[in-house]
């Protein structure tokens, strides 16, 4: 369904609020899929309007009645049309995304920044860190670098590594490191832990690929713009997660902690490893497939974890 600006739209849409309402209506009517930074049509329309008009994200409500020039309407409606007809995620249309209160560059080199781990970062990882003295932290499967850079931003005394197998993702992460002056973040190319020999951490955080093959094949069109490498994770979504569980103890201090997102693969992980004491994080909006687990717990159950990982 096209939403190109018609003469009627040019005549009847006058203000910022008019355009936001129009965009939200078109997005809802088109049955778009949300979840790439924003979870509803109104927020997506708002971000596209503000981006097209070069306005700040915290624009006061008084500006909502500001009238637009004809050329400004054209810019806004062109973005609306791409969102509807091409199903391009908003973050890829605007070129940026918010994560943990920070604005990151976003493009198809890496997944759009989104993870409930942002809430943990802004809460200082409490109560999970429980007073641990973190000096070195790792963001494994860093993608755009959003988790690593946010950890470094809110914990300037930490030394943070961001590791990823994708050179494309690391190039984007480097741009975000420069953009956000993340001087305490180092980016490393690594296939899981292979490029991190000799490095040890008090905290490892990971948002790895965890979407099953069947789910990946059935994802809405919006997800097709993202690199499949960051999504697909085998028949049950745990191919990479099990390797992380197996190898993390070699890179954690004895009292170290692993925090990992597995999304809807949570139930399968618990079914495979019922003996492991995973602490599932409760977020403000409920439980969302993120666990914390102690290094000693992974060591105690290394054999069954390693056996499962070897099957992948």
From Swiss-Prot:
It holds the Pfam family MTS. The gene is prmB. It comes from the Bacteria. GO terms for biological process: methylation. Methylates large ribosomal subunit protein uL3 on a specific glutamine residue. The keyword Amino-acid biosynthesis does not apply. Its EC number is 2.1.1.298. NCBIfam families: hemK_fam, L3_gln_methyl. It comes from Xylella fastidiosa (strain 9a5c). The keyword Methyltransferase applies. Belongs to the protein N5-glutamine methyltransferase family. PrmB subfamily. GO terms for cellular component: cytosol. It catalyses: L-glutaminyl-[ribosomal protein uL3] + S-adenosyl-L-methionine = N(5)-methyl-L-glutaminyl-[ribosomal protein uL3] + S-adenosyl-L-homocysteine + H(+). GO terms for molecular function: nucleic acid binding; protein-glutamine N-methyltransferase activity. It is an enzyme of class 2 (transferase). Keywords: Methyltransferase, S-adenosyl-L-methionine, Transferase. CDD domains: AdoMet_MTases. This is Ribosomal protein uL3 glutamine methyltransferase.
């Amino acid at each position: 369904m096209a939403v190109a600006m018609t003469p009627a739209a040019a005549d009847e849409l006058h203000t910022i609020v008019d355009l936001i309402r129009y965009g939200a209506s078109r997005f809802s009517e088109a049955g778009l899929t949300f979840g790439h930074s924003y979870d509803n049509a109104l927020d997506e329309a708002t971000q596209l309007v503000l981006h097209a008009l070069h306005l700040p994200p915290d624009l006061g409500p008084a500006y909502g009645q500001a009238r637009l020039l004809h050329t400004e309407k054209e810019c806004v409606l062109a973005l609306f049309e791409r969102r509807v007809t091409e199903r391009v995620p908003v973050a890829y249309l605007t070129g940026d995304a918010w994560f943990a209160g920070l604005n990151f560059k976003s493009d198809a080199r890496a997944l759009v920044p989104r993870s409930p781990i942002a809430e943990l970062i802004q809460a200082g990882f409490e109560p999970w860190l429980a007073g641990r003295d973190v000096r070195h932290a790792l963001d494994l499967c860093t993608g755009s670098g959003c988790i690593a850079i946010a950890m470094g931003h809110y914990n300037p005394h930490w030394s943070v590594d961001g590791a990823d197998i994708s050179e494309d993702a690391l190039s984007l992460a480097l741009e975000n490191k420069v953009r956000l002056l993340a001087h305490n973040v180092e980016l490393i190319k690594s296939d899981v832990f292979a490029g991190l020999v000799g490095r040890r951490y008090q905290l490892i955080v990971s948002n790895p690929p965890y979407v099953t093959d069947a789910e990946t094949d059935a994802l809405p069109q919006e997800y097709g713009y993202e690199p499949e490498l960051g999504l697909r994770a085998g028949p049950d979504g745990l191919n990479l997660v099990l390797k992380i569980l197996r190898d993390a103890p070699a890179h954690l201090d004895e009292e170290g902690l692993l925090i990992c997102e597995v999304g809807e693969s949570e139930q399968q992980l618990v079914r495979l490893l019922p003996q492991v004491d995973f602490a599932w994080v409760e977020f403000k909006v409920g439980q969302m497939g993120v666990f914390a687990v102690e290094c000693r717990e992974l060591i105690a159950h290394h054999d069954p974890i390693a056996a499962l990982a070897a099957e992948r």
